[in-house]
Amino acid sequence: MKLRIIAVLGTMAFAPALMPALASESTDPAIGDVSVFATVPAPGHPFGVAVDKNRIYISTSAGDFFASPATGGHLNSDGERVFAYDKRGNLVKTTVIATMPKSDMGLFGLALDGNPTATHNLYVADMNGRILRLALDRDAPAPELFAQVPPPYSGLGWHASMWNDLVFDGEGNLFMTDDKPRLWKVTPDGHASIWFEDSRIAGLFGFAGGPLGGRIDPSGEFLYFTITISGYFPGEAVVYRLPLVDHPSASDLQVVHRFPAPSGQIPPQAAGLAFAESGNIYVGLIGTNQIAVLDPAGNEIRRISSPLFDSPWGLAFMGQSLLVTNADIQEPGIPANWKVLKVFVGESGLALNRPRTSDEGDH
């Protein structure tokens, strides 16, 4: 779910003391240096990011109810995109994802499997309740439907179930965040079922603001996920975790970190997150336009700020830098801000699970 709280509650005074971080002029970058990695063409509004061996994949969500709820949001009839870039930020391929006319919701999470080149795939979360599978590194037809929300939520769009982010476990299952508020498990054959529900992970507005970003920790034993704007801790952004067991209970839910919502300021609004090898957790804050850094125990140890940030949404490691998508959540949008930014953080990312999903291509 995406939401500029200012668009819902009205204009609020907000003038945080941010320390801008721009790319260092020296050859050795400093922690927090920010530069432009790539420019995103229309329809813009980059959300998801995934880093492959020699490609960077970016998903878009130009359709956006939450850009301006009072007017019905930003409507998009031109489809969404998955853009492929090389490691230098050059656009090399574009895949069009068809959407409904005047769509008000698009794409977010991306996950790569570990299949060899002949059967390598990208899994794409459509926030209207689908997972699409896109064949990579070969000629292929349009993306195929891999999974969708089951009854009674099927066919009702994001109002009933919004699949935001997705991440593989070591067995090839996909775990999905849904801000209605639920967490889902999708088996390797595409069967989706609710894995966890609890009123404490609901967003402030009930139908919005709940689970958004999700990643598995270095131990492989916990799913960490963000709450954009909490109802249980009103206005705060929260990082929770759950053990990766078959049926987690309410007592299994653990608070990792709470981002306070100071009175008179736009709430922080957590979006995507990413783990470093060290166990540090990087969290995009789209309200304050910052990246927060938590240590493995959940204590905040740093904030990265830059005037280049505009709704820093998706996060993925490339070397010792984070790639960060500028979602540009506002109406009207600012095309000049449709960027993928590169943030030097001085440590490497945790390798994501990339299971084999097919035996084809073996020799």
What name fits each language-model region?
Residues 59-78, 225-235, 327-338:
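Short, conserved, GDST-rich strand-edge loop motifs in beta-rich repeat architectures
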Residues 69-74, 78-83, 130-132, 182-185, ...:
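A short loop-to-beta-strand structural motif that recurs across blades of beta-propeller domains
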Residues 41-54, 68, 99-121, 151-180, ...:
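Beta-rich, blade/repeat-based domains predominating
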Residues 25-42:
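A short helix->beta-strand "capping" segment at the edge of beta-propeller domains
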Residues 52-55, 85-86, 90, 113-121, ...:
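Flexible "stalk/tail and boundary" regions
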Residues 35-38, 92-98, 142-150, 193-199, ...:
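Beta-propeller fold detector
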Residues 134-139, 241-249, 345-350:
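Short loop/turn segments immediately following beta-strands, especially the blade-tip
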Residues 63, 128-130, 181-182, 287-290, ...:
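Loop/turn residues immediately N-terminal
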